[in-house]
Amino acid sequence: MARHFGMALAPWDVMGGGRFQSKKAMEERRKNGECIRSFVGASEQTDAEIKISEALAKVAEEHGTESVTAIAIAYVRSKAKNVFPSVEGGKIEDLKENIKALSIDLTPDNIKYLENVVPFDIGFPNTFIVLNSLTQKYGTNNV
């Protein structure tokens, strides 16, 4: 619809709420006694977040950077003509990584690779609505 009508997109949480981090960054955090600064979820990455972070790191290396967040932003920006992602960051280094994304053009192979790392999650409220209606219809053991 956005493409058809020439609408802009402003995706939110494109960097996974700070949960997309390279293995090196996570090891450094642990060494310093830090965890992921997140309002929602555990202080460690989930298996899916680890897989996504590793894939972002692999693509980042192909583009000559260590910034998984720059790749995440570049990925979202590649999906439509007018994309203005809402980005976060609490340090100057975060801002520099966000800006770096503007100079990264992902290849079709990069995009395909990133899209196949984990199954697509349609997210809330869709998962809640569908799961709730299925459990009501079939019971929790059958969903």
Curated annotation (Swiss-Prot):
Family designation: Belongs to the aldo/keto reductase family. Aldo/keto reductase 2 subfamily.
Job of this protein: Putative aryl-alcohol dehydrogenase.
Any GO BP annotation: aldehyde metabolic process
UniProt key word Oxidoreductase: yes
The name this protein goes by in its record: Putative aryl-alcohol dehydrogenase AAD15
EC number: 1.1.1.-
Keywords of this entry: Oxidoreductase
Gene: AAD15
Enzyme class: oxidoreductase
GO molecular function: aryl-alcohol dehydrogenase (NADP+) activity
